[in-house]
Amino acid sequence: MLLWLAQHFQDEIGPLRVFNFITFRAVFATLTALAIGLFFGPMVIRMLQRLKVGQAVRTDGPQTHLIKSGTPTMGGALILLAIGVATLLWTDLSNRFVWVVLIVTLGFGAVGWVDDYRKVVYKDPKGMASREKYMWQSIIGLFAAVYLAFSVSAPSNSQFLDLFVAWVQSGFSMDLPPKADLIVPFFKTISYPLGVWGFIALTYFVIVGTSNAVNLTDGLDGLAIMPTVMVGTALGLFAYLTGSATYAKYLFIPHIPGAGELIIFCGAMAGAGLAFLWFNAHPAQVFMGDVGALALGGALGTIAVIVRQEIVLFIMGGVFVVETLSVMIQVAYFKYTKMRTGTGRRILLMAPLHHHFEQKGWKETQVVVRFWIITMMLVLFGLSTLKLR
C-alpha cells in the first residue's frame, strides 16, 4: 500500500523513491510488526483473560506443566495481525507470491483457531479431530501446491494460465522448466526433475508437514517461536537472492521473478515473532496456540517451495524435523511392541523430544535455549549452502 502511494507521488517528492528498495521496506516491515505486537500484546492478553481463553493442559504430560493451566492461549492471533498489517503496508500488493503465502498463512491460522476454540470451549486438550484438521490442511496445501507448480515456472499470472492449460491439453503429463526442479544443496548443477505431479506432491508434503512440525514443537515457553524467527529470516535472505537475476546467476540458484518481495513477509514474521516472544518467554503470559503454530509452519513451508529450497528448509528446521520424528517413532514403536508382545513400550520417556529431556531432569529454560542454539547452528549451515557448491 505504501509502495503504491510512494510511487504515485515520487516525482513530486523525490525522497519517496527509497520505497522502491526492497531492503528498506523489509526493515520497516520488521519494525512495524514488532511495534504492533508490543503495543497490542497487553491488550490481547487482557482480552483473552476476560474471555477465559485458558490453555487446557494434558494431565499425562510433565507434572511441572500443570501450573500452566489457565494461561491464555490463541495468542497466535496477535502474530497474524502483526504480520498481516505489516505485510500489507510495506509489500507490493500486485505480487502473486506474497498473496499465496498470506492465503496459506491465514488459512492454516483459521484451522488452528477452530482447533483452539474447541479446546477452550470444551476443555479438551485434543481439540479438533485429527482427521478433520488434516482434511482442511490438505485442502489448503493442495491449493497452494497446484498454484505454485505453475506460478514458480511462469513470470506472470497470464503465463501461469497458459502453462496450466498446456498441462491439461497434454493429458497431465507435461514437464516443468528446470527452475521447478528439486535443488540439491552443495552442487551447482545437480537437481532432480519433479514433473507436475512430483512438484505438487513435494509441495503438499513440505507445507502440511512443516505446519504440523512447528505445532508439535510448540510445547514449551518460547520453544517454537524463536526457531521460526531464525528460519524465517534465513528464508527471507534466500527469497531476496532468488528474486535477483544477478545474485541468482552468481550463486547458481534458480531465479524466480517476484520472489524477492517475500523478504518483506519474512521481516514481518520476524518482527511479530520477536514481539510475541516478549510475552511468551518463560514464564509465559500467553501461548500462541494452534492458530499461530499451524500458520507459521505453513508460511515457512510455502516460502521454501517458492524459493526452491525445500532441502535447505529440512536442514535449517532440523529441530522441527527431529521433534516430529520423535513423535512418529514413539507411536510406531509403541504400536509395534504392543502388537508383538501385548505390552506397548516406549523409546523415549515422553514425546515430543523436548518432554523427554524434561523427564531426564533438564529445566524448561535449558531445553528451550539449547534448542535455540541448535537451530542457530543449523540455520548458519543452511546459509552456507549458498557458497559451498
Curated annotation (Swiss-Prot):
GO terms for molecular function: metal ion binding; phospho-N-acetylmuramoyl-pentapeptide-transferase activity; UDP-N-acetylmuramoyl-L-alanyl-D-glutamyl-meso-2,6-diaminopimelyl-D-alanyl-D-alanine:undecaprenyl-phosphate transferase activity. CDD domains: GT_MraY. NCBIfam families: mraY (TIGR00445). Coiled coil: none annotated. Signal peptide: none annotated. The gene is mraY. It is a multi-pass membrane protein. Its cofactor is Mg(2+). Catalyzes the initial step of the lipid cycle reactions in the biosynthesis of the cell wall peptidoglycan: transfers peptidoglycan precursor phospho-MurNAc-pentapeptide from UDP-MurNAc-pentapeptide onto the lipid carrier undecaprenyl phosphate, yielding undecaprenyl-pyrophosphoryl-MurNAc-pentapeptide, known as lipid I. This is Phospho-N-acetylmuramoyl-pentapeptide-transferase. Pathway: Cell wall biogenesis; peptidoglycan biosynthesis. Its main location: membrane. Keywords: Cell cycle, Cell division, Cell inner membrane, Cell membrane, Cell shape, Cell wall biogenesis/degradation, Magnesium, Membrane, Metal-binding, Peptidoglycan synthesis, Transferase, Transmembrane, Transmembrane helix. InterPro entries: Glycosyl_transferase_4, PNAcMuramoyl-5peptid_Trfase, PNAcMuramoyl-5peptid_Trfase_CS.
